Design a protein with these regions (language model features):
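Short, positively charged and aromatic/hydrophobic N-terminal segments
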Residues: 10-35
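A structured, charge-rich N-terminal accessory region that forms the first stable segment of a protein
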Residues: 41-105
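Short, structured patches in soluble enzyme cores that scaffold and shape functional sites
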Residues: 73-75, 115, 193
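A glycine-rich, hydrophobic loop/mini-helix early in the fold
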Residues: 84-142
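Internal catalytic-core helix/loop-beta-alpha segment
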Residues: 135-162
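Hydrophobic/aromatic-rich, well-ordered segments within soluble, folded domains that form packed cores
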Residues: 160-187
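Long, compositionally biased
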Residues: 191-232
Length: 232
């Protein structure tokens, strides 16, 4: 059952809308091929622009470097968002990527793209299990049940449970410290807030950024999105 735009907006506002962020990126890069996005009379986003948007925000996950990414979409910028997303199902399924619409309103939707096998293994790590257990999850449950519980909490609380970092593959140490320090006193801020081993995290973040740049360049050069998505 869809929640109202007002109900879901308090969650959506916690993370950037990929469409709007992409417009900023579009202005910086001056990509004329995506100039439709800056026109007030633009009606819908093309498939190629959607692929570029996915690449810009989710390349590390689609290229196999990162196990998951959470993106928000403004559905009115698509002629048919459901159909657009569904058209990628064969590619994602073949490459081992699952898609879960975590929270949805009339206007916005939060979509989790994740490599189920990797996340399923990750949540069974001793430190990840301990954190989930401390947050009230059944750490013996399979990934599907854990995600259903995460989804339920997001709908009820209308905010991001801190443990969502575990489902995005963030180090449990960083997730736990984020909770304990209430998001403050971190050693490094990048793709997430780092509390332990900032040097390793800095190198990882640099790899993610390089991956995104390479992915987007290949798309610009004419590569097919499906060919750039790595199987796992």
């Amino acid at each position: 059952m869809h929640r109202s735009c007002m109900e879901v907006s308090c969650i959506i506002d916690k993370i950037p809308l990929v469409n709007e962020n992409y417009l900023q990126y579009n202005d910086i890069r001056k990509r004329e091929k995506f100039s439709f996005a800056n026109r007030k009379d633009a009606m819908c986003m093309s498939r190629s622009s959607f692929e570029a948007l996915l690449g810009f925000h989710g390349a590390p996950t689609f290229a196999g470097e990162k196990p998951a990414v959470l993106l928000s979409f403004k559905k009115s910028q698509f002629e048919d968002f459901d159909a657009m997303l569904a058209s990628f199902t064969p590619c994602f399924r073949c490459k081992g990527i699952s898609v879960l619409r975590l929270v949805e309103g009339e206007e916005y939707v939060l979509v989790l793209f994740y490599r189920a096998r990797r996340i399923a293994r990750f949540v069974k790590r001793a430190d990840a299990r301990a954190l989930l257990r401390s947050c009230g999850y059944d750490d013996d449950a399979p990934l599907s049940v854990l995600l259903a519980e995460l989804q339920r909490r997001m709908e009820i609380k209308k905010t991001f449970p801190h443990e969502i970092g575990i489902f995005l593959g963030y180090p449990p140490e960083d997730v736990r410290s984020f909770i304990e320090h209430r998001g403050k006193d971190f050693a490094l801020s990048g793709y997430w807030k780092v509390y332990g081993n900032p040097d390793a995290a800095r190198a990882l973040f640099a790899r993610y950024t390089a991956c995104s740049e390479e992915f987007c360049k290949k798309l610009d050069d004419g590569a097919r999105f499906e060919d750039l998505v790595v199987a796992s």
